[in-house]
């Protein structure tokens, strides 16, 4: 069993992972309205990844014979409607998640739970990848500016992204 402080921190992070899924689902809807199917696909993969991250936490808490505690998932707040604004918010959100995962790791280290530290190492590495992936799309959007043809080409590129179920832990 995990220390109660660590259990609570895992439950808080589980909620944040579910919020991430919810946020990206809302953003996906905006791109669907804009008929940007590549961006829809990119966010669909992101939604699936966030669900997998949440389920990894869920399964880990159960495996450790600890208690799951669910709390409300906040309504997503989307700060802009353009692809650039949305991806700026995605990067900001992923940086927030990285900070949150690091805080969870801090608790695991504080209570000296080596199993949790080992488990969370995957999430730490995953966040590096998440920020890099978002940063790549964001850099392209910044280069594109108001060029609609370039946006269309990026949309065609993003349609090729596929979800690969992660092996967590």
Locate predicted features:
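Iron-associated oxidoreductase/ferritin-like identity signal
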Residues: 1-169
């Amino acid at each position: 069993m995990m220390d109660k402080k660590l259990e609570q921190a895992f439950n808080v992070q589980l909620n944040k992972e579910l919020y991430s899924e919810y946020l990206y689902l809302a953003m996906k809807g905006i791109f669907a309205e804009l008929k940007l199917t590549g961006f829809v696909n990119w966010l669909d993969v992101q939604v699936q990844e966030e669900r997998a991250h949440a389920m990894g936490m869920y399964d880990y808490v159960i495996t450790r014979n600890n208690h799951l505690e669910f709390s409300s998932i906040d309504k997503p707040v989307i700060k802009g409607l353009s692809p650039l604004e949305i991806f700026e918010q995605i990067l900001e959100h992923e940086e927030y998640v990285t900070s949150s995962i690091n805080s969870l790791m801090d608790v695991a280290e504080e209570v000296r739970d080596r199993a949790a530290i080992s488990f969370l190492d995957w999430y730490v590495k995953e966040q590096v990848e998440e920020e890099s992936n978002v940063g790549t799309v964001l850099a392209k959007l910044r280069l594109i500016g108001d060029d609609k043809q370039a946006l269309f080409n990026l949309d065609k590129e993003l349609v090729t992204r596929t979800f690969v179920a992660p092996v967590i832990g």
